């Protein structure tokens, strides 16, 4: 006989109102015919108890699969009866498997069905998140034996565990070059290069704290890499924005100059765009363009309407000289508050095998420096705030570049010692690049 749902009046309140409720989803899993249904019932009962007592009953521990030191988030239930046994024994363990997604997060619908069925067929709760904040597929709810069984089947599908704990974490990349017209690099190849190079650091935690990679193909930063990753790789270009003047003029004639001025021209952060009053053609002062992506985003949905048949170019498109900008130190609140990434490589081509090796080498320098110099439970951005960006750049072997900063400082009192040496070094580097 199937186990009955517990009475959960406090959780039931969360099902009221117009918005979807996680409680409704858990109840559906609890009454479905699968091996993990009783686990979900007891999880609901534990959560109801927490709402009554205002206490949390989940604690960490150590759970893993053979050969791995990370990738599992252990959760044990501390809610016991008078005899010291689990009050809700089916929820005594509720561990989470972090699974690395494919680069660009490409799945077939059949694969998603197979993963869902496999999870519950091996004792899982059925609760899956696509994807967690680190980019993982989160299979939430399995006991220790179930964790190993589920992992074994996942391996047969070709999946591997992601990172957890003080380690290199699972990376993320946008869909990018696979389907997006804004892409400036092969995002999937960059991510794959980094993951393959540092997989051992992901599966065997040995760092002071977490280290994350994220790759976005343009400054829209769909992966939120500049805010959420220690090494953020963002696609960009360094030549001129490409303008399809024929389609642009059609759009202005149809939408009207007021619409274009209000929604595109006036919203340029550096005011580097202007429209000729007679020809209606667009001019861009590309030297002052900061690649904010607004004009490209505003015109992209209209391209199909104003392009000639057979013309697949955007009204506005990224330039042809494409590459990436690399930032370090992005993170959410921890010790010193939220941080955006700091530019350390203003522009880098990523086309040849040597280019990918250079990114891998730079990432390795960052991880090694982080491992040796960060304090316990300190992210890369916090370490840089503590030791200074100049020391960090010196430690990873990068020269200071004026393009790393948005604008010069306004303080007139500046130290000028070593100014001549640094200026000479800068011009020598420029000559080497030209050569």
Where are these regions (language model features)?
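Charge-rich, low-complexity segments
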Residues: 1-84
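Small-residue-enriched alpha-helical segments and adjacent helix-cap loops
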Residues: 4, 12, 29-33, 65-71, ...
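Short glycine-/aliphatic-rich beta-strand segments at the starts of folded cytosolic domains
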Residues: 45, 51-108, 170-178, 341-348
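Flexible, glycine/charged-enriched surface loops at secondary-structure junctions
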Residues: 124-131, 164-166, 204-210, 275-278, ...
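Terminal amphipathic helices with adjacent charged low-complexity linkers/tails
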Residues: 145-155, 385-410
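A glycine-rich phosphate-binding loop feature that marks nucleotide/adenosyl-phosphate handling sites
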Residues: 171-174, 211-219, 380-393, 413-415
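A structural signal for small-residue-enriched, beta-sheet-centric alpha/beta enzyme cores
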Residues: 242, 262-265, 269-270, 274-275, ...
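Intrinsic disorder at enzyme termini
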Residues: 405-435
């Amino acid at each position: 006989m199937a186990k009955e749902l517990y009475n959960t009046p406090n959780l039931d309140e969360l099902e009221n109102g117009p918005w979807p409720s996680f409680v409704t989803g858990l109840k559906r899993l609890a009454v479905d015919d699968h091996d993990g249904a009783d686990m979900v019932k007891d999880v609901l009962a534990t959560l109801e108890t927490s709402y009554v007592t205002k206490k949390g009953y989940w604690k960490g521990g150590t759970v893993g699969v053979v050969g791995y030191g990370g990738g599992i988030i252990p959760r044990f239930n501390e809610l016991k009866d008078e005899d010291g046994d689990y009050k809700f024994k089916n929820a005594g363990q509720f561990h989470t498997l972090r699974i690395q997604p494919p680069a660009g997060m490409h799945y077939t619908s059949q694969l998603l069905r197979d993963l869902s069925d496999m999870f519950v067929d091996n004792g899982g709760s059925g609760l899956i998140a696509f994807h967690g904040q680190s980019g993982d597929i989160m299979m939430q709810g399995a006991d220790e034996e179930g964790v190993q069984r589920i992992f074994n089947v996942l391996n047969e599908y070709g999946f591997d565990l992601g990172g957890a704990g003080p380690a290199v974490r699972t990376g993320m990349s946008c869909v990018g070059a696979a389907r997006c017209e804004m892409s400036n690099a092969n995002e999937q190849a960059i991510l794959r290069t980094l993951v393959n190079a540092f997989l051992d650091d992901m599966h065997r935690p040995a760092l002071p704290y977490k280290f994350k990679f994220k790759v976005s193909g343009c400054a829209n930063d769909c992966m939120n890499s500049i805010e959420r990753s220690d090494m953020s790789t963002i696609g960009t270009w360094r030549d001129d924005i490409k303008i399809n003047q024929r389609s642009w003029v059609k759009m202005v004639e149809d939408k009207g100059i007021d619409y274009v001025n209000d929604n595109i021209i006036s919203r340029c952060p550096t005011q580097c765009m202007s429209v000729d009053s007679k020809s209606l053609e667009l001019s861009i002062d590309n030297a002052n363009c900061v690649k904010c992506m607004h004009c490209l985003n505003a015109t992209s949905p209209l391209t199909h309407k104003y392009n000639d048949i057979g013309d697949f170019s955007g009204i506005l498109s990224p330039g042809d000289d494409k590459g990436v900008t690399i930032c370090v130190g992005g993170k959410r609140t921890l010790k010193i508050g939220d941080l955006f990434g700091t530019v350390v490589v203003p522009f880098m081509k990523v086309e040849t095998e040597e280019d990918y090796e250079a990114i891998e080498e730079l990432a390795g320098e960052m991880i090694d420096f982080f491992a040796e110099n960060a304090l316990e439970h300190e992210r890369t951005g916090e370490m840089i705030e503590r030791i200074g960006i100049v020391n960090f750049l010196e430690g990873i072997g990068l020269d200071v570049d004026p393009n790393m900063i948005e604008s010069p400082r306004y303080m007139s009192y500046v130290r000028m010692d070593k100014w001549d040496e640094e200026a000479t070094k800068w011009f020598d580097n420029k000559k080497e690049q030209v050569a």
